[in-house]
Design a protein with these regions (language model features):
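Juxtamembrane low-complexity tails/linkers enriched in Ser/Thr-Pro and polybasic
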Residues: 1-3
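ER/Golgi luminal nucleotide-sugar-dependent glycosyltransferases, focusing on the catalytic module
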Residues: 5-267
Length: 267
């Protein structure tokens, strides 16, 4: 009788331990799943790729291959990679660099935007750009919200008030071979500080994302009318190498201000 009681007690304790083990495994799995975007949430993120002469082989690599994408092609060279997640390939005239492409996408898709739009240049094969773009996607996935990887300044307009450029050459080798021009078409209003004042009325912002790599929440885009973006793109429609593109690079936070749905993370 005593042996039977001991046996029953052992079975009971073993059952409790087994239950606790299975509960912990189940809890860990669910916590892990909640920390990352599920497939449905990944479909709410779209990559907008501004391509000129790059091969875009990276588009099939992890983590880029997790997300739907649209490619805007600005050259006659159509020899580049797409992926099963590519929803469209759009040909555009070669004006305005990537900045024009980004505004064009917003204008054309104003009523059909993804919850999070991630803007990438085609040159993510370059190590510095690849590292930043991969981190951006990882931060979006981990934080489950839009993220802006950036450098922080006390006041962007004041920091870059006198900034202007007379020459600039594409940093990607394939792009510079196809288009070796380095003379910039000067902005009608310059330097940056005056241009910024004209566009954004001296709005104070503190964050800048370089390399044309950043993302925006749909709500932040739609809080401004389509005409807001239609007016801004005019500065980028007449030249393949506009100085204004470098001004926009420093002013994207003003374009979408306030970015209240976004987590700012300094690089």
């Amino acid at each position: 009788m005593r042996k039977r009681n001991k046996h029953n007690t052992f079975i009971f304790i073993l059952a409790i331990f087994l239950f606790l083990f299975l509960y912990l495994v189940y809890s860990f799995y669910n916590i892990k799943e909640s920390l990352y975007l599920n497939d449905s949430e990944k479909d709410d993120v779209q990559l907008v790729i501004a391509r000129y002469n790059e091969d875009l082989k990276w588009i099939n690599d992890d983590p880029y291959n997790k997300y739907k994408n649209i490619i805007y092609n600005k050259s006659d060279n159509s020899d580049f990679s797409t992926s099963p997640k590519t929803t469209d390939v759009v040909s555009l005239p070669n004006v305005g660099r990537c900045d024009h492409t980004y505004l064009y996408h917003i204008i054309q898709n104003y009523d059909n935007l993804a919850n999070i739009t991630v803007f990438f240049p085609g040159s993510l094969n370059m190590k510095n750009k690849k590292n930043k773009s991969m981190r951006l996607l990882n931060e979006i996935e981990n934080n489950k919200q839009n993220v802006f990887l950036c450098s922080k300044y006390e006041n962007v307009q004041e920091e870059f008030y006198g900034f202007q450029m007379d020459s600039w050459k594409a940093s990607d080798e394939k792009n510079s071979i196809l288009n070796p021009e380095n003379k910039l078409d000067s902005s009608k209003i310059r330097p940056f500080g005056k241009w910024y004042s004209d566009k954004f009325n001296d709005l104070k912002i503190q964050h800048v994302s370089y390399y044309g790599i950043f993302s925006v929440n749909k709500k932040e885009i739609l809080q401004h009318p389509k005409s807001h973006y239609e007016n801004l793109i005019k500065d980028l429609e007449t030249s393949s190498n506009p100085e204004a593109g470098h001004f926009f690079e420093r002013a994207w936070v003003a374009v979408f201000h306030p970015m209240s749905e976004t987590k700012f993370i300094e690089e």
